[in-house]
C-alpha cells in the first residue's frame, strides 16, 4: 500500500488548504499528541507547557472527572476510582485483569472486563476515551481548528480485540481514526526519515505496560516489518512491582489495603526514575495503619531485581531474529522506544545483546507520537517533497480455518505483510451438501484443538451436488489496522457469507508465548497427529463412498466378492478410531484394493447408460 499523494513538482499545499491531522501515542503510563507544523513533526503541549499527559482518570461523586496529572496526584488517596495503566485491560477478560494484580474491583461483563467506580461500572474503552478526548481538545486548541482525523499507535502484539477496543475508544472521543499504526513502525518512521538509514534495524519498545520488539528492513524509503515479538503484559509497571516486593520483603503486599498498595507503587516508580541518574534512591511509605516502610535502593540492587524482566525482553528479541532468519550481527542498529528504556540496565543489556550502542537520538517518550504525526499528515493529504515512503507491517500469528478431521488449513502465515488478502478453494464432503460451516482459527499448530478459535459462520444455499463438485472460495483479508474479515463464496451461484472477526477478548501474554513456543516444541507430534487425522478422514470418505456405491450398484458383485468387500468395509470403518496411522492406512488400502474391480464395473454401467439409445453420429 503506497502512501502517496501526487501533485505537481514543487507544489505544496497552501496553509489554509492543509488538513489538520494528528498522531496520538495512547500509552500505558503517558499519552501524547503530535502534529506536523511547518513540515516538522512536534509534540503538542498543554496550557502549562506539559507534553506528557499521564494516562490516569479519576472519577468523583456527582459525575466530575479528573484526567492526567491531577488524577495521578490522587491515586494513592483514592485508588479504586483513579484508573491508571488502563491500556493493560483493553480487550481483556475479567480473568486476565484479576491475574494482573492491579488494585481495582473488576466486574466480568460480556465482551470485556469493567472497572467498578463511584460513577458505575466502566469499560477500559470508556476510560481510554476520556484520555483521547483531552488530547483531541489540546490539539484543536493548539492548531486552531477541527481535526480531520488521527493516527493512533498500538503495540504490534495487540490482537483484533485490543485493536478494535482502541478504535471504539477513539470513536467515543470524537476522533476519526485514519489508521492504527504499530508503535515500532511509528518509531521507524521518525528515525528513518531523520537518519535516512538503510539496513536491518531492531525497534526495542519498552513502555509502562507493554513490550514490543520488531525487526525492520529499511530499503530506499520502504519500511518493512519482517518479524515481531513481545509481551502484552510486561513494562515499567512490572519493574515497580519488583521494587515493592524487595522493599516489603516479609510483608503480604496483596493483603494490604488498595490505597497502601497504590502508595507503594508510586514510591517504587519514583525510586526507579531517580536511579536513572543517581547511584541510590530512597523508598519511603507510611501505611494507613501508621507503619513506615523505609529502604534505600542502590542501582546495583535494582539491576539485580530488573535482570529477569530485562531477560524476558531479550528472549523475545532472539525469537524475533530467528523468525526473520537473521543473526544478531545482521542488525545495524537498535532504536529505543518508551520511557522505560531510560533505565541504564536496559540500555546496557540491549547493547550487549546486539553488540552496538542503542540509538537514542530522539526522546524515547516522544518518538512514537512523532512518527504517528508524520503518518497522519501523509494520510490527510498533506504530502511534502520526499515523503514517498511505504509501510509494511506484519501479522504476529497465523490465520487459518478448520478442515475435516479437526485439522488447520493455514491461509495467512504469521509475519505476512499487511494489508493482505489470501484466498483458497474448498469443496463439500458429502453428496447433496447444501451448507458449509467455516471455523476461523489463529495459531501455529496443526490441530484446531491446539489453536485459538476466532469466529464461526455458515455458508448456506450451496447447490446440491456430488461430494467434491462444489467450489467454495474462502478469502481472508487483514486490513492495515490488523483487523480480519473472512468471506466464503460458492462460485457457481455467487451465494456468499462473511464475518468480521472481533473476538470477545484478547490473548494473554502467557497464551501468546505458549502458542509460539508450542509450535516449535510440538512440531514432531503435530506432524504425526496431522498424518493420523488425514488417514482417518480418508478412511471415513472411502467408507461413505463405498457404502453409497453398494447401495446403488451392489448387484454387480457376486456373493463371494460382496462378502470380501463387506469385510474390508467393516475393518476400514473400525480403523477410523485407531491411533495407529499405519493400521488406518493399511485398512484404507485393503478396501481400495477390494473395490477396484467393483469401481470399474460401475464405470462401465454408467457409460452404457449414458450411451443407451444414442446414434454414433450424435457422439461425433
From Swiss-Prot:
Highest taxon listed in the record's lineage: Bacteria
This protein's UniProt keywords: ATP-binding, Chaperone, Nucleotide-binding
* The keyword Nucleotide-binding belongs to this UniProt entry's keyword annotation: yes
The answer to whether UniProt assigns keyword Transport to this entry is: no
Extract the InterPro entries matched here. Answer: ATPase_NBD (IPR043129), Heat_shock_70_CS (IPR018181), HSP70_C_sf (IPR029048), HSP70_peptide-bd_sf (IPR029047), Hsp_70_fam (IPR013126), ISC_FeS_clus_asmbl_HscA (IPR010236)
* Xref: SUPFAM superfamilies: Actin-like ATPase domain, Heat shock protein 70kD (HSP70), C-terminal subdomain, Heat shock protein 70kD (HSP70), peptide-binding domain
State the disulfide connectivity: none
Gene Ontology terms, MF aspect: ATP binding; ATP hydrolysis activity; ATP-dependent protein folding chaperone; unfolded protein binding
GO BP, sorted A to Z: iron-sulfur cluster assembly
Q: Name one Pfam family in it.
A: HSP70
Q: Which family does it belong to?
A: Belongs to the heat shock protein 70 family.
Q: What is its biological role?
A: Chaperone involved in the maturation of iron-sulfur cluster-containing proteins. Has a low intrinsic ATPase activity which is markedly stimulated by HscB.
Protein known as: Chaperone protein HscA homolog
Biological source species? Bordetella bronchiseptica (strain ATCC BAA-588 / NCTC 13252 / RB50) (Alcaligenes bronchisepticus)
Amino acid at each position: 500500500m503506497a502512501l502517496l499523494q501526487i501533485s505537481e513538482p514543487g507544489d505544496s499545499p497552501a496553509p489554509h488548504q492543509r488538513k489538520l491531522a494528528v498522531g496520538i501515542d495512547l500509552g500505558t503510563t503517558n499519552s501524547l499528541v503530535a502534529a506536523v507544523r511547518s513540515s516538522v513533526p512536534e509534540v503538542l503541549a498543554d496550557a502549562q507547557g506539559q507534553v506528557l499527559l499521564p494516562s490516569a482518570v479519576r472519577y468523583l461523586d456527582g459525575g466530575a472527572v479528573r484526567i492526567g496529572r491531577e488524577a495521578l496526584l490522587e491515586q494513592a488517596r483514592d485508588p479504586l476510582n483513579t484508573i491508571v495503566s488502563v491500556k493493560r485491560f483493553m480487550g481483556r477478560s475479567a480473568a486476565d485483569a484479576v491475574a494482573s494484580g492491579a488494585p481495582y474491583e473488576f466486574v466480568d461483563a460480556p465482551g470485556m472486563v469493567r472497572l467498578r467506580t463511584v460513577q458505575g461500572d466502566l469499560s477500559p474503552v470508556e476510560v481510554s476515551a476520556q484520555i483521547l478526548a483531552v488530547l483531541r481538545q489540546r490539539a484543536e486548541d493548539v492548531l486552531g481548528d477541527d481535526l480531520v482525523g488521527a493516527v493512533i499507535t498500538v503495540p504490534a502484539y495487540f490482537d483484533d480485540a485490543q485493536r478494535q477496543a482502541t478504535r471504539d475508544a477513539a470513536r467515543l472521543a470524537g476522533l476519526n481514526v485514519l489508521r492504527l499504526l504499530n508503535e515500532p513502525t511509528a518509531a521507524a518512521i521518525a528515525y528513518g526519515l531523520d537518519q535516512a538509514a538503510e539496513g536491518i534495524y531492531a525497534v526495542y519498545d519498552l513502555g509502562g505496560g507493554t513490550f514490543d520488539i520488531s525487526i525492520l528492513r529499511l530499503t530506499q524509503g520502504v519500511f518493512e516489518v519482517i518479524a515481531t515479538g513481545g509481551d502484552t503484559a510486561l513494562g515499567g509497571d512490572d519493574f515497580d512491582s519488583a521494587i515493592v516486593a524487595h522493599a516489603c520483603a516479609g510483608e503480604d503486599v496483596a493483603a494490604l489495603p488498595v490505597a497502601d498498595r497504590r502508595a507503594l507503587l508510586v514510591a517504587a516508580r519514583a525510586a526507579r526514575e531517580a536511579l536513572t541518574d543517581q547511584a541510590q534512591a530512597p523508598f519511603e511509605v507510611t501505611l494507613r495503619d501508621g507503619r513506615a516502610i523505609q529502604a534505600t535502593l542502590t542501582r546495583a540492587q535494582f539491576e539485580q531485581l530488573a535482570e529477569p524482566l530485562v531477560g524476558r525482553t531479550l528472549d523475545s528479541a532472539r525469537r524475533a531474529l530467528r523468525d526473520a532468519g537473521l543473526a544478531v550481527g545482521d542488525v545495524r542498529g537498535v532504536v529505543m522506544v518508551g520511557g522505560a528504556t531510560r533505565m541504564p540496565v536496559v540500555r546496557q543489556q540491549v547493547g550487549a545483546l546486539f553488540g552496538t550502542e542503542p540509538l537514542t537520538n530522539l526522546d524515547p517518550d516522544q518518538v512514537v507520537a512523532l512518527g504517528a504525526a508524520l503518518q497522519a499528515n501523509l494520510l490527510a493529504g498533506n504530502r511534502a517533497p520526499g515523503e514517498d515512503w511505504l509501510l509494511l507491517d506484519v501479522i504476529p500469528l497465523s490465520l487459518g480455518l478448520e478442515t475435516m478431521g479437526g485439522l488447520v488449513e493455514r491461509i495467512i502465515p504469521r509475519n505476512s505483510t499487511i494489508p493482505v488478502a489470501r484466498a483458497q478453494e474448498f469443496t463439500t464432503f458429502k453428496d447433496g451438501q447444501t451448507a458449509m460451516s467455516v471455523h476461523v482459527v489463529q495459531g501455529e499448530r496443526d490441530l484446531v484443538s491446539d489453536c485459538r478459535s476466532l469466529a464461526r459462520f455458515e455458508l448456506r444455499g450451496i447447490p446440491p451436488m456430488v461430494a467434491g463438485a462444489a467450489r467454495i472460495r474462502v478469502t481472508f483479508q487483514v486490513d492495515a489496522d490488523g483487523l480480519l474479515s473472512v468471506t466464503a463464496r460458492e462460485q457457481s451461484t455467487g451465494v456468499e457469507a462473511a464475518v468480521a472477526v472481533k473476538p470477545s477478548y484478547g490473548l494473554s501474554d502467557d497464551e501468546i508465548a505458549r502458542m509460539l513456543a508450542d509450535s516449535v516444541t510440538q512440531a514432531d507430534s503435530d506432524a504425526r497427529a496431522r498424518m493420523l487425522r488425514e488417514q482417518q478422514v480418508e478412511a471415513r470418505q472411502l467408507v461413505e463412498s463405498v457404502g453409497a456405491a453398494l447401495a446403488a450398484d451392489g448387484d454387480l458383485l457376486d456373493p463371494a466378492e460382496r462378502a470380501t468387500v463387506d469385510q474390508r468395509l467393516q475393518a476400514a470403518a473400525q480403523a477410523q478410531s485407531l491411533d495407529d496411522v499405519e493400521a488406518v492406512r493399511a485398512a484404507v488400502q485393503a478396501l481400495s484394493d477390494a473395490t477396484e474391480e467393483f469401481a470399474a464395473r460401475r464405470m462401465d454401467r454408467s457409460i452404457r447408460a449414458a450411451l443407451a439409445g444414442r446414434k454414433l453420429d450424435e457422439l461425433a
